[in-house]
């Protein structure tokens, strides 16, 4: 089987609070949610040997970042509002040329707007932070890579990795 070399080429963004706008060619950077499992150090309470990490069973908070060229004054009206943001990218396999969609959807708040300093010759940019993410889905070519909503267990590659725990706790 040939190795794949997939690269995201282009991306667009939409916000449910601004239904008539699509942000596309102005996106310079997009920071997708980092999936980080929570761990705590355990030193063995005096036992010899190295400190070990124990999974807490909790993921770290999800955040996203966005850097766009220009001044988007309409986004100030969305600041602190709960909205559904959708980011759609074109992922191309550099080996085969096959293109597939990559979509990230997050129910969250626009929690940060940081204008960069404007210099005389460069383009003005703004950094945006999406915070208080209460639901997130990452889907590539119709396949769920990650899915989660507040009060639900996370799914990785479409599988609830906490299904056994949920059953023991009577959550299913």
Give the location of each predicted region.
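Oligomerization/assembly interface segments of phage tail-like spikes and tubes
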Residues: 52-72, 122-135
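A generic structural micro-feature
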Residues: 56-58, 79-81, 98-100, 120-124
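Catalytic micro-motifs at enzyme active sites that drive phosphoryl/nucleotidyl and oxygen chemistry
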Residues: 52, 75, 94, 113-120
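Polar/acidic, low-complexity leader/linker segments enriched in S/T/G and N/D
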Residues: 1-39, 158, 164-172
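Short, acidic/charged, Gly/Pro-enriched secondary-structure junctions
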Residues: 70, 76-104
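Mixed-charge, glycine-accented linear interaction segment located at domain edges/termini
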Residues: 108-172
